[in-house]
Amino acid sequence: ISLAYMLYFGAIVLLPQLLQEVYGYTATWAGLASAPVGLIPVLLSPIIGRFAHKLDMRRLVTFSFIMYAVCFYWRAYTFEPGMDFGASAWPQFIQGFAVACFFMPLTTITLSGLPPERMAAASSLSNFTRTLAGSIGTSITTTLWTNRESMHHAQLTEAVNPFNPNAQQMYSQLEGMGMTEQQASGWLAQQITNQGLIISANEIFWISA
């Protein structure tokens, strides 16, 4: 549960930052794009709780792992420049099924079989390790995102040189739109940064899957 929470919380932190830095979302719109993940758990959690004694928790957790992998792969191969709001919101909505079928069933499995006098201590330890894993996941995700962006930025920048006809053609097009050479260089640098952020985020999503 701690490892899964590490991946889940890292993605929660990464997605709004990506939407704001690359796609120009405000904090409100980034929150709205992330919010659909909470819709399904609101509906399913009471149902799962009511029929928990009739359900095999292991199957629910396995289903949630599969859904997590599907959503992370979905993001890894669909996040690209110019994507619309739905491209970020739909994976969040589907991930709600994974959230609903993960936390409560896995907590039930973790605490099942313990004597009543040890239940409080086990629950506290489980909550502590889950919170700690979330903090570690956030640190790892943000650090990896920054470092990978720097690497991809350097690799992409190498292609922008006087010997690359595509780069020279782009400069000519930008200057034809009224930009000076300095403005064109600044615009290209921003596009390279955005590409680096998207590629590094997609790599993190792929690893998480």
Q: What do these predicted ranges mean?
A:
Residues 1-121:
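Transmembrane core module of solute transporters
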Residues 35, 115, 127-128, 209:
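Charged, amphipathic alpha-helical interaction segments
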Residues 126-208:
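Hydrophobic transmembrane architecture of multi-pass small-molecule transporters
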